[in-house]
């Protein structure tokens, strides 16, 4: 089963866009050109019969600009005030863009209690199902104006985690995180020239978490650990997840066409299928790793280069075979 086959069957899709994807880095203002392109992509997915849920960052940034604040809010109260001002303005922009295509949208603001409290969760799920049945595009954000860290239910902490929880809540088939990174590497590519891009993750284990910046890693790629944690939530719930760079918003089209864009984290179901199909190749690569570990008297960089050469000699890009391989 290749990537195109996996993605062709996706019907209920959650797409998260980060602040850096929909704003200008220099000014913090909304990038209306990119946001309009994003909306057109979503409309096209809807026209294909897909159910689409958007998780959108940006409320705090929009509120900060509206309030004339030059710097990011330093206190929780200031952040929540910015979110309260910005959320309505952000939704107004989305609504105006979607209205050009006669597409209805709905604002859905969640707190952690919406997921962890049984009754709240039930109501939230029913709301999403009904909105999708009515052909409405839900636009989701955390209710930052009232979310807290310390009380019984806490908060999501970041929109990657929020998006994963939404995907789990609605039984989504696919979660796409559009962010400021290409995907996942075996090491920080800014520090290690031998870092390899990982196209597909079959299984999330401790070594992969270390690559993402866990306690065992010396080369964490900022923000990647939250994305791996999001992948654990989504894939455990049966959704595949893709991390891709939001600089090119049209990458969403390429993803849905099955092109090798970003890093694909396979759900447990698809992971087992892929595991079986790739077993012979993975066995070969494990032998190469074993020989690599036995190497003595060579620098780490030299050994890594040698391992990569062995990969290429064997005719495979084994970064994509990740899952108890590295």
Task: Set out the residue ranges of the language-model regions.
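C-terminal catalytic "cap/lid" subdomain
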Residues: 1-72, 76-104, 108-326
């Amino acid at each position: 089963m290749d990537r195109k086959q996996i993605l062709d069957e996706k019907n209920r899709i959650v797409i998260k866009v980060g602040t850096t994807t929909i704003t200008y880095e220099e000014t913090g203002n909304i990038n209306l050109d990119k946001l309009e392109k994003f909306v057109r992509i979503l409309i096209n997915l809807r026209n294909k019969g897909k159910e689409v849920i958007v998780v959108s960052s940006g409320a705090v940034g929009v509120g900060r600009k509206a309030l004339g604040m030059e710097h990011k809010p330093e206190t929780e109260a200031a952040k929540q005030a910015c979110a309260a001002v910005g959320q309505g303005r952000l939704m107004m922009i989305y609504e105006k863009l979607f209205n050009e295509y006669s597409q209805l949208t709905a604002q859905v603001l969640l707190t952690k209690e919406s997921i962890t409290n049984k009754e709240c969760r039930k109501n939230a799920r029913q709301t999403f199902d009904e909105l999708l049945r009515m052909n409405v595009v839900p636009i989701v954000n955390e209710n930052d104006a009232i979310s807290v860290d310390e009380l019984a239910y806490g908060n999501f902490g970041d929109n990657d985690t929020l998006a994963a929880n939404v995907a789990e809540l609605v039984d989504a088939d696919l979660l796409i995180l559009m962010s400021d990174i290409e995907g996942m590497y075996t090491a920080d590519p800014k520090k290690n020239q031998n870092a390899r891009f990982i196209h597909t993750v079959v299984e999330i284990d401790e070594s992969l978490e270390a690559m993402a910046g866990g306690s065992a890693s010396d080369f964490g790629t900022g923000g990647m650990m939250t994305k791996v944690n999001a992948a654990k939530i989504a894939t455990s719930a049966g959704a595949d997840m893709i991390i891709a760079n939001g600089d090119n918003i049209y990458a969403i089209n390429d993803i849905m066409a099955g092109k090798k864009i970003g890093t694909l984290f396979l759900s447990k179901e698809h992971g087992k299928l892929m595991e079986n199909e790739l077993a012979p190749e993975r066995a070969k690569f494990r032998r190469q790793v074993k020989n690599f570990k036995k190497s003595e008297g060579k620098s780490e960089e030299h050994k890594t280069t040698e391992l990569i050469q062995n990969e290429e000699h064997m005719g495979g890009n084994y970064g994509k075979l990740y899952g108890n391989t590295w």
